[in-house]
């Protein structure tokens, strides 16, 4: 799976990457998008962090003609500020890529 390869080699070490949504559940249809959660262990994200961690997934999407939507959070924000329903869905259905 190319998305797993990007997760393991295309983004800086230390990030936790989780595939979620229909692709993770196995009920994706042709043309379904890919949803990826990127968790960063730092206090605050800068605009350049969003680009640094998102761009490799966007680039893969352009290459394979697929929509890949990375959601980038600090661990702290994920645990305290992320929508609880979103968190529950990721925790239930997510596949850890790295």
Language model: regions and residue ranges:
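Catalytic core of pol beta-like nucleotidyltransferases
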Residues: 1-18, 24-30, 41-98
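Short beta-strand->loop micro-motif that forms the acidic, two-metal-ion catalytic signature
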Residues: 34-39
């Amino acid at each position: 799976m190319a998305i797993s390869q990007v997760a393991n080699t295309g983004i800086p070490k230390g990030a936790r990457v989780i595939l979620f949504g229909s692709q993770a559940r196995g009920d994706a249809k042709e043309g379904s998008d890919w949803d990826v959660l990127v968790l960063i262990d730092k206090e605050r994200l800068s605009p350049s962090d969003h680009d640094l961690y998102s761009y490799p997934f966007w680039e893969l999407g352009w290459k394979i003609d697929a929509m890949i939507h990375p959601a980038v959070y600090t661990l702290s924000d994920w645990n305290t500020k992320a929508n609880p329903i979103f968190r529950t869905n990721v925790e239930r259905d997510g596949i850890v890529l790295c």
